[in-house]
Regions:
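Pyridoxal 5′-phosphate
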Residues: 1-410
Length: 410
């Protein structure tokens, strides 16, 4: 169902983000989004009024303990995980959570078993798995086709065997910007008796997550790229969690705390709850009433805000013969607003240096998809120019960027 996104709605949503009034145009959102005032207020209030340790018997400690529990429950709701199917593990970053997960697997996998790793991945979901080779676990590469930037299911099927322990891949490449068919991949992997580790960091800002519906075993995203504090969340299916022992103190057996070494940021958990306040504003429901259908609706609205903006940028880049888009050139439901390109003659660094002077935030480089840049024959340090949009970006901001790119690309 198409939604009409009016200028008034855009301004209403933007009004919740104080940083958007500073004069900087934020088009580097794949590196980290801005936060709404509701998130910042929750963090401030917690630090000033509730900054105590958890697990004690007095009232304020009990309330803080419940707040951290509520944050886990909210993130599970955001990720679309059914309550009896899995748990949410909170941590400082997707990189740290995936390294923790790999370390846990290193204690149960056997020499000669294999992990399949997608070449299109962010290093956070690549390096931890390739390093299992020190334990005799072999890496099989799910290679990208440089013609269409895809990792084919036929190739995956050929790679899978009775030695496959798990398959690690991005739901959306943070450089290419295309949504893959996660359910189809998961079905294929499960038929081979292996586990799925999906990196949803570049997907989560743009669409609603549905981990139970997809059937994934592990799914990670960064909360600071979805309008929240600098944290990350890893959802684990119950049977997958049951195969592992977490790294926390030996006497901590409760899940998820067994996997949260040192515990999550308490003020960060408060900030996560502030995101529910913002999403309630997006869909216009009463405070404290956010449900799963509201989350779905909020992300439908946000995707509808993004679509004309990313479509205009793709149209502009496609119109230039001196530019090659690294990723799908055609807009559509499987395309998010993370758009990368290279120039026929100019370095990516030279282009971004021109744009930087105009207080428009974009980025160049490998975006931590270092191996993907190598596979594309791009010098990783120069890499691509990446423009990454989210729902609070406007058509006027893109026109401003295009005006600057006309100069930078000339």
């Amino acid at each position: 169902m198409s939604l009409e996104i009016t200028p008034q709605l855009r301004e209403e949503l933007r009004s919740h983000f104080p940083a958007l009034a500073t004069g900087t145009v934020y088009l580097e959102n794949a590196g980290g989004s801005q936060v709404p005032v509701q998130v910042a207020d929750r963090i401030r209030d917690y630090l000033l009024e509730s900054y105590v340790q958890l697990g004690a018997g007095y009232g304020l400690s009990k309330r803080s303990t419940e707040l951290v529990h509520q944050a886990h429950s909210l993130v599970r709701l955001l990720m679309g995980g059914k309550e009896n199917e899995g748990e949410v593990i909170l941590g400082s970053s997707a990189s740290s959570l995936l390294q923790m997960l790999s370390d846990c697997y290193s204690r149960v996998l056997q020499a000669g078993q294999e992990v399949i790793v997608a070449e299109t991945g962010h290093e956070a979901n690549v390096g931890p798995w390739t390093r299992l080779d020190r334990h005799g676990v072999e890496t099989r590469w799910w290679r990208m086709n440089p013609e269409d930037f895809s990792c084919s299911l036929d190739q995956l099927e050929d790679l899978l065997s009775d030695r496959t322990a798990l398959v690690a891949f991005p739901h959306v490449s943070n450089l290419l910007g295309e949504i893959v068919d996660i359910r189809q991949i998961t079905t294929l992997v499960h038929e081979a008796g292996a586990r799925v580790v999906a990196d949803g960091v570049a997907f989560a800002p743009h669409r609603a997550m549905r981990v139970s519906e997809w059937g994934v075993d592990w799914y990670v995203y960064s909360t600071y790229k979805v309008y929240g504090p600098h944290m990350a969340a890893l959802w684990g299916r119950s049977d997958a969690l049951g195969e592992l022992t977490g790294p926390n103190h030996y006497f901590i057996r409760d899940v998820p705390y067994q996997f949260e070494l040192g515990g999550p940021s308490h003020e960060g958990c408060a900030g996560l709850l502030g995101l529910s306040d913002y999403l309630e504003k997006v869909v216009g429901v009463e405070e404290g009433s956010l449900g799963r259908s509201d989350i779905d609706r909020a992300f439908e609205i946000m995707a509808a805000c993004e679509q004309p903006v990313q479509s205009r940028l793709l149209e502009y880049l496609c119109s230039r013969e001196d530019v090659r888009i690294v990723g799908p050139e055609v807009d559509g439901p499987a395309r998010v607003g993370t758009i990368s390109f290279v120039h026929a003659d100019k370095s990516s660094q030279a282009i971004t240096e021109v744009v930087d002077r105009t207080e428009i935030g974009i980025r160049h480089g490998h975006m931590y998809a270092y191996r993907l840049c190598e596979a594309l024959d791009l010098a990783p340090e120069d890499g691509v120019v990446r423009v990454s949009l989210v729902h609070y970006n406007t058509p006027d901001e893109i026109e401003r960027l295009i005006e600057v790119l006309d100069q930078a690309l000339a």
